[in-house]
């Protein structure tokens, strides 16, 4: 969702052509990667020493706070505020991921750690796939409330016939959203060269410029962002509560050690 925010709105508003936005969106997201790369190893070392529960739970709190900050950020934001929040998002993710994995692996006997690792990876990948579907559904629901009327009014204002404007506005919002993500001017794509050629030169220039579509999309897109980041923050809080209730760390003994204790008469408990 952050990539769409950058590619579809922020980068065009700041002078980047649509065919350059995929590259620059990735570059501007590097603070998140850096935050994860720094916090992951550090939190892993600290969790080995002090336990996983506190650090992993703190990670979910940082993660949730970053989503709240992104909710409060204007659509046309200052980059340094955005970079700080996505870095916090990466830091929180790293603080949770490493201790949580350690806690899972430390809660099963040594002979079962391969199975535990496989199940952890399966649930993580499944959760990622499901979350993508949920997030885009929430975003489209938010866009659908105001994008059609906003888009129709903007097109009519620049001379597009009302019938054509309403036809474009009635298309699924996902078509407008993903056209910009693919590095294509959405308005040029949606109207087509035939209709554009019938408009005055000034109208063509504004419609196909870098700022028309992002300016129209700001308010509808923000409505979707509020829903997406609000749900994400709430789920992060629930994850924090679940993390807080985890048991104390215990590293099960190896099968050889268990057999040795049994032979010596020492109970397992």
Regions found by a protein language model. Name each.
Residues 15, 24, 125-242, 253, ...:
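Hydrophobic transmembrane architecture of multi-pass small-molecule transporters
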Residues 29, 39, 97, 107, ...:
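Selective for proline/serine-rich intrinsically disordered segments
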Residues 115, 256-257:
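Intrinsically disordered terminal tails
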Residues 5, 61, 80-81, 154-155, ...:
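Short, intrinsically disordered/low-complexity patches at protein termini
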Residues 12, 45, 49, 75-79, ...:
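Transmembrane helix-loop junctions in multipass membrane proteins, especially transporters and channels
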Residues 1-101, 105-111, 115, 131:
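Transmembrane core module of solute transporters
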Residues 42, 69-73, 138-139, 239-249:
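Residue-level signal for alpha-helical transmembrane segments in multi-pass membrane proteins
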Residues 119-123:
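Hydrophobic alpha-helical segments of secondary membrane carriers
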């Amino acid at each position: 969702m952050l990539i769409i925010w950058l590619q579809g709105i922020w980068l065009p508003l700041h002078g980047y052509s649509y065919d350059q936005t995929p590259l620059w969106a990735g570059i501007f997201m590097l603070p998140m990667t850096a935050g994860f790369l720094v916090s992951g190893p550090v939190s892993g070392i600290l969790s080995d020493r002090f336990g996983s529960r506190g650090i992993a739970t703190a990670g979910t709190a940082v993660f949730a706070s970053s989503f709240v900050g992104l909710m409060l950020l204007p659509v046309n934001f200052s980059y340094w505020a955005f970079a700080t929040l996505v870095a916090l998002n990466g830091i929180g993710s790293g603080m949770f991921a490493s201790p949580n994995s350690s806690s899972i692996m430390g809660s099963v006997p040594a002979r079962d750690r391969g199975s535990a690792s496989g199940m952890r990876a399966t649930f993580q990948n499944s959760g990622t796939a499901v979350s993508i579907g949920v997030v885009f559904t929430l975003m489209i629901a938010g866009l659908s409330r105001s994008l059609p009327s906003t888009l129709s009014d903007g097109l009519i204002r620049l001379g597009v016939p009302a019938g054509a404007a309403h036809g474009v506005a009635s298309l699924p919002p996902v078509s407008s959203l993903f056209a910009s993500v693919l590095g294509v001017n959405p308005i040029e794509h949606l109207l087509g060269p035939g209709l554009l050629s019938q408009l005055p030169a000034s109208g063509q220039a504004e419609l196909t410029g870098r700022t028309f579509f992002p300016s129209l999309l700001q308010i509808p897109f923000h409505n979707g962002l509020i829903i997406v980041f609000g749900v994400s923050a709430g789920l992060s809080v629930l994850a924090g509560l679940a993390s807080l209730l985890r048991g104390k760390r215990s590293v099960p003994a190896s099968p050889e050690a268990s057999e040795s204790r049994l032979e010596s008469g020492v109970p397992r408990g």
